[in-house]
């Protein structure tokens, strides 16, 4: 009989599973090589249909229950968030065999301290994306980066970037639920946690995988 590998400490521990979920997600905001650095982010369009895309996780905090992403304020995605802030973020770590889904409400913040700090702390090349002359997703005649010809292949300076600051916005997702799935030959483990506003705490339960 083949002996199954030993399982991690969180395998049958609801509290440790919750901590590991946040450990993985928080690592994704600081480690560009982490699988959690580029999760799938889902919003809802005007027809109620889900719209998915890969985004870079810029910040994550279990203390404030927030995830932060950056977007173009003119984008379809931004319009969806303004119309309906319901958002779901999916992480998958193949090596750890972990899937984590975090869901909540998103605020679109084009101005304010959070957006200003995020803009200032981004590299010039990252901010160059917001110099596109038209809104992301609009049809164009041929293949193009959408950037003005004079900045193609060049690093913009602060003066050049300043005029395009209004195109930048942060997406701040306030997490209200966390779902966890760990895959194991010995038997999968699944759990979820809901934020309880009245108690200011998380309430978790095991689920059938």
Go through the PLM ranges and name each one.
Residues 1-209:
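Binding-site signature for planar aromatic cofactors or substrates
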């Amino acid at each position: 009989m083949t002996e199954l590998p030993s399982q991690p400490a969180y395998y049958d521990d609801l509290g440790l599973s919750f901590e590991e979920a946040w450990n993985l997600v928080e690592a994704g905001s600081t480690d560009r090589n982490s699988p959690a650095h580029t999760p799938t982010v889902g919003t809802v369009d005007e027809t109620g249909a889900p719209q998915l895309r890969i985004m870079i996780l810029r910040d994550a905090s279990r203390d404030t229950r927030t995830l932060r992403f950056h977007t173009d304020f003119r984008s379809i995605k931004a319009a969806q968030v303004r119309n309906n802030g319901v958002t779901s973020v999916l992480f998958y770590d193949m090596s750890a065999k972990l899937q984590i889904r975090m869901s909540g409400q998103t605020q679109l913040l084009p101005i304010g301290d959070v957006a200003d700090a995020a803009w200032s702390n981004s590299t010039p090349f990252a901010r160059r994306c917001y110099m596109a002359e038209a809104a992301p997703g609009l049809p164009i005649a041929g293949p193009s980066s959408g950037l003005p010809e004079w900045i193609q292949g060049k690093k913009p300076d602060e003066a050049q970037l300043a005029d395009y600051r209004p195109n930048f916005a942060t997406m701040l997702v306030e997490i209200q639920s966390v779902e966890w799935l760990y895959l194991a030959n010995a038997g999968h483990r699944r759990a979820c946690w809901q934020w309880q506003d009245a108690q200011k705490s998380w309430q978790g339960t095991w689920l059938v995988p």
